[in-house]
A protein has these predicted regions:
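Catalytic-core regions of core metabolic enzymes
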Residues: 1-653
Length: 653
């Protein structure tokens, strides 16, 4: 691969059993190479890896690709060996790609290196690709002759013992030759650090990720494949969306999106025109546009007037514009130019189905002549021999799409990136860690109050009373009241009827005490204390919660609260590295958010205190690394636009 791809640098094969390999002089050992070595590619039996790496490091080799498999991915013994190798590499200040990888490719003329065991010759492009799976790499390279995929850099990372997605993300962001960054990942090596790169606005280029392991079974398979820690796919979905990272559903989507960013300008909006010579494919394209949340552009009167002068009377000047099968290449070009000139149009999908009497090749070439600042995507559905001729065009050819639905997804991804790419200010830590070392499991009410005071969390005034000593003098609140039974063992008080609300007298308070005590006894739970609170009649009940994900770190949630929270599942989740826009999205993306706007004559709820609570909660879990989860549920929204956190659980580790 190195030789046939045209690498012009020096190559030193090392193998004690050969004198020459493919015309290159072969050396019996690393030590016998009488030259500096910039890059070492190691493909030796696993038993020889540690020794070979040692020789390379002794020779001051700073970059190593370890292709050999049989490390972390096969179990504990392999994991231990991988760690030993990594330790040596780190101590020497070198970097390692792999192990269990396929190698790397650099297509740019100043390097021109294919250091993989796949002999394909990818064309030079401005897309970088990083894959955790060597088999996916091989599959992608094996399909190059059937696709328009072009690469600048191509990395098979394997187990990511050292070089991982974070390293390459930063490297490619700074590389002016690279325009689009793509990943196939089965795990995130340092997920929280990955997100911080976006939270600090260090990454500006479009990033597209295909994540293997969506289902529980898929996550398990990915873990056994890579030996890496998995995470819930809902968390992956949430964080990628939050930071403007495009998520592909398959390889076709991944590289279609990359082609879009590499070859076309970003759409200014979401209004799309479809031009076709066949009705069916246009309908499929329109369905895909609507599914992706895009709009079918309303063509202006002047545009329709111009189109009527060109299009056959039985064709259509409405969007989608239909030239019928007899539309000639020059006519196709003119129609595309007219529609692109319409101020109501942000992007155009041009679909050409090749009839016997009109050449697809000529139609494509004519449309390629168009100069426009708007994205113009061509779908071509030609006779089979077209693709053979097309692949012989020079490297500057514009990419084509084969399915009428594909451009809709590309436009949707580009519009998503366009909306998310602007600079935003994200939350940072506010305080140093509060000392929670003496706390185990769920925090005590006293410690909860300390946190609440520190972060301005509006917990409703509460009084902790030992069982058996409730009397008129111990209650500082006016009626009505709420009485709760408290125990660290009890997660959901309502499940055992341990909450009594709207208590209007001392007699009702005593009865509530007896009822709660009886409920604890029935359920074999130890009642530690009673909690007395003022009763606030709710207008709405919301939830604000959070947890520390093992991969991506602190997460926060907002949604409908109360005892039916799991049933309604009306929750929006994001990383705790929030921007003000993220907080607005959290509220707006829930059904509760719709209710808070006011429905059926109700007045809208003032959202400023809710936004502040979400922000304070995020800061709390960002600052305090021992907090593993917290749950403010319910948070009562009163009729006079006040909020009260009436039930709190905070767990530490």
């Amino acid at each position: 691969s190195i030789k046939t791809y045209g690498y012009k640098g020096k190559v030193f094969p090392v193998n004690p059993k050969a004198d020459k390999i493919l015309g290159y002089k072969c050396y019996p050992s690393v030590d016998s190479v009488n030259s500096d070595i910039d890059l070492a590619i190691v493909a030796v039996p696993k038993i020889s890896v540690e020794e070979t790496i040692g020789h390379l490091l002794a020779k001051k080799v700073s970059s190593i690709i370890l292709i050999t498999a049989g490390f972390k991915e096969v179990g504990e013994a392999g994991k231990e060996l991988e760690y030993k190798v990594l330790l040596k590499v780190k101590e020497a200040g070198a970097r390692l790609v792999g192990p269990n990888c396929m190698g790397v490719i650099n297509t740019f003329e100043d390097v021109k290196l294919n250091a993989t065991f796949v002999a394909e010759k990818p064309e030079t492009g401005r897309t970088a690709f990083f894959s955790q799976s060597g088999a996916v790499c091989a599959a992608v390279l094996n399909t190059l002759r059937e696709t328009d995929i072009k690469f600048g850099h191509f990395i098979s990372a394997g187990n990511k013992a050292d070089v991982c997605e974070n390293d390459m993300l930063l490297f490619w962001e700074k590389d002016s030759k690279i325009k689009t960054i793509t990943f196939y990942l089965e795990s995130f090596e340092k997920g929280e650090e990955f997100l911080k790169l976006f939270a600090r606005n260090e990454i500006k280029k479009p990033v597209i990720i295909l994540k293997g392991g969506r289902s529980a079974t898929g996550i398990k398979a990915a873990q056994s494949h890579t030996g890496a820690l998995g995470t819930n796919d809902k968390v992956v979905e949430a964080v990628l969306d939050q930071f403007g990272i495009i998520r592909a559903n398959n390889l076709n989507e991944l590289f279609n999106a990359a082609k879009g960013f590499e070859n076309f300008p970003l759409p200014a909006g979401n209004r799309v025109a479809v031009i076709t010579n066949g009705g069916g494919p246009a309908i499929l394209a329109v369905d895909a546009l609507i599914k992706e949340g895009l709009k079918l552009a309303e063509l202006s009167g002047s545009t329709k007037k111009k189109l009527k002068e060109i299009i056959h009377p039985e064709g259509s000047t409405e969007n989608p514009v239909d030239l019928l099968p007899g539309g000639a290449p020059e006519q196709f070009k003119t129609v595309n130019e007219i529609v692109l000139g319409d101020n109501n149009v942000d992007a155009v999908i041009s679909i050409f189905v090749e009839p016997v009497m009109v050449s697809a090749e000529e139609a494509v070439k004519k449309i390629n002549e168009i100069k426009t600042s708007k994205p113009l995507f061509q779908t071509v559905m030609p006779l089979p021999e077209f693709w053979t001729r097309y692949r012989k065009w020079d490297n500057s050819r514009k990419p084509l799409f084969r399915n009428p639905e594909d451009p809709a997804k590309v436009i949707s991804n580009m519009f998503f990136y366009q909306q998310k790419k602007d600079h935003r200010t994200f939350l940072k830590s506010k305080f140093s860690d509060l000392d929670l070392s003496g706390e185990k499991g769920f925090l005590s009410p006293k410690m909860i109050n300390s946190l609440a005071e520190r972060y301005g969390i509006p917990i409703i005034p509460s009084l902790l009373i030992k069982r058996g000593i409730i009397n008129k003098s111990t209650n500082p609140f006016t009626y009505p009241l709420v009485l709760k039974g408290y125990s660290k063992e009890l997660i959901h008080k309502s499940e055992i009827d341990a909450v009594k609300i709207d208590i209007k007298s001392f007699e009702e308070l005593l009865q509530a005490e007896m009822d709660i005590l009886e409920s604890f006894n029935k359920n074999n739970l130890i009642l530690e204390d009673f909690l007395v609170q003022p009763y606030i009649k709710p207008k709405h009940e919301i939830l604000v919660g959070g947890f520390r994900d093992p991969v991506f770190g602190p997460m926060v949630m907002f949604g409908s609260g109360g005892k039916y929270v799991e049933i309604f599942n009306d929750i929006c989740m994001k990383s705790a590295y929030l921007s003000d826009k993220d907080i607005e999205e959290m509220i707006n993306r829930t059904k509760m958010g719709e209710l808070l706007k006011g429905v059926r004559g109700e007045s809208p709820f003032e959202l400023s205190e809710i936004k502040e609570l979400i922000k304070s909660s995020a800061r709390m879990i960002l600052d305090n690394h021992s907090i593993t989860e917290f749950d403010f549920n319910p948070v009562i929204l009163s009729k006079n636009d006040q909020i009260f956190v009436v039930d709190v659980r905070i767990k530490t580790n």
